[in-house]
Amino acid sequence: MVLHLRAPKGKVSVEVMLNRAKYFDRTGKVNDHTIYLSGNLGKNALEFAMCLSAKAKGGRVYTMGHTLVVKGADEAVLYFGADSTFRYASADVASWEPRVQEVLAEKITEKLERAMAREYGGLLAEHEKDYREFYDRVALSLPEKEENAALPTDERLQRIISGGTDEGLAKL
C-alpha cells in the first residue's frame, strides 16, 4: 500500500507508528527509514510481520524507537507491506526458526525497497492499470430522462409487478 502526502514547501511532517491492540511480539526499527511490528496469532498459529517505510523530497526521514518520522518535507511517500506464514510451506517456515518473524520482515522490506526505487507516478499508473482490469469489466447505464420520476415508489413497483417497465427505478 502506498500513500502520497504533499503540502506547501516544507510543511509535511508526520510521526507514524504501527500498532495492534494485542497479540504482537515486537516493534522496532529495520533501518533508518523503515519500522516493523511482528507477532503471532497464538501458540502454534500463524506468525506475521508488517513494515512501514518512507521516502521524502525536501525533508528528513528517520526512525525514533518504533516511530517513523518525516520532518519538513515538500512531499512524502509512505510504503506499507505485510506478510504471514499462511502462504508459505511448513518446511520453509520451519527452516526459518527461531527467526520466523524476522525473515517475514526481511521479505517485506525487500519488496518495499523495490517499490521505493520507483517513482510514485509509476506505482500509481500500475495500480490504476491493475484496478481497471478488475473493475472495468462491467458498465451500468441509467436513463437520463425519467418519465416516472414524479410517481411514488410504491406505484412504480406496482407497475413493474403488473408487467410494465421502469428503467429509472434502479437509481433508487
Per-region residue spans from a language model:
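Acidic/polar, glycine-enriched structural segments that form the non-catalytic walls/loops
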Residues: 1-172
